[in-house]
Amino acid sequence: MTAPRRQRFFSWSMGLIACHLALSLSQASPALLPGVKPSSQQRLSVWGFDVYDARLWVRPGFSVASYSAHAFVLELSYLRSLEGEALSKRSIDEMRKVGAFSRDQENNWLKAMLDIFPNVQKGDRLQAVYAPNAGAEFFFNDKVIGRIQDPLFAQLFFGIWLHESTSAPAIRQAWIKGL
């Protein structure tokens, strides 16, 4: 293959890969919950380190203030590697800022998250589908990885980003303005 042909093939291949990625990213979450549309993407950075880009996929009429009344998808696109254990433990800490729960609930939820949440690498996506009064279903790179069928867990877990007591108020405010 001549150099110009290799370059054209490389450019064509990269374009095809970029199109595939764009399509898979834009179509994955709607497939998880039909009728949803993406909100603005928001970046979480901690101490100057980018952690993930967060996006809500919501149906018309969704309100951040009454998030627990609506089905929606939360999508986190990771920008760095993190251990599933760290994600699980941090989730419990953040959930405690949103609402109260017993030590037994904490132990049960932590065990469930430890079983579900994988170690993530840069480029991985964790998606969570909220079902009002039912619980949450989790996906890793578009594959089901588990469910926690506990309405209080789900309300507090998604409250990490959506409750007024969130430790990420800039993300919540941007979503309020963008919806």
Where are these regions (language model features)?
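Bacterial N-terminal signal peptides
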Residues: 12-24
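Ser/Thr-centered flexible coil motifs
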Residues: 2-4, 24, 102
